[in-house]
Amino acid sequence: MAVTRRLLISLGLVAGLALALSACDAAKPSAYKAIDITGAEYAQDLGLPDTEGRVRHIAEFKGRLVVVFFGFTQCPDVCPTTMLELAEVKKAMGADGQKVQGVFVSIDPERDTPEVLKAYVANFSPDFVALRGSLDETKATAKRFKVFYAKVPGKTEGSYTMDHTAGSYVFDTSGKVRLFTRYGTGAEALKHDLQLLLKQG
């Protein structure tokens, strides 16, 4: 997946907002490996249907840490790597792994049918949830999360891939958005942050 200027700008905006939120406490280093966005006014809820047609909200996962990633099933690298790392972290956390909920939001509803999405997330963990809205719903949700995505023409006529923000949002057990973890941070860093959030309650 090509990293475009717009994608870098999108990541920069998230990082910039995180810095603004922590400006009043700049002297105290963050305990997290990811970007601490506690108190952010964006990324508040999902409100998209799952593969069974049930509309899902962050609030229903109360008591669990929720890791939300926007991607597409035909993504060759970032998406499967991100989901695999999350599955590995969930397993490595043992009993605490049951308190981690992975949510995959499709940015390509034209190709990602409910059947395709259901099979895709099941490859990583039977507990993971996949969400798929209409084109308009997807656009609106991505905007609420400050997630950038766009079609990129493929090598053959009519084909395309997707360019998108490469990172996940982490919600604490009370349903509040807390972290933005960039792609490439690694499984160990994610495990550290999830365990810390659970410890904090």
Residue map of PLM features:
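N-terminal export leaders
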Residues: 5-9, 13
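Structural microenvironment flanking redox-active thiols in thiol-disulfide oxidoreductases
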Residues: 81-141
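A short beta-strand-turn-helix
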Residues: 46-66
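Hydrophobic beta-strand anchors of alpha/beta hydrolase catalytic cores
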Residues: 67-68, 102, 168
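C-terminal motif of bacterial Sec signal peptides marking the signal peptidase cleavage site
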Residues: 20-23
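Short active-site neighborhood of thiol/selenol oxidoreductases, capturing the structured segment around
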Residues: 59-80, 86
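Thiol/disulfide oxidoreductase modules built on the thioredoxin-like
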Residues: 137-193
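Bacterial signal peptide processing site
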Residues: 25-28
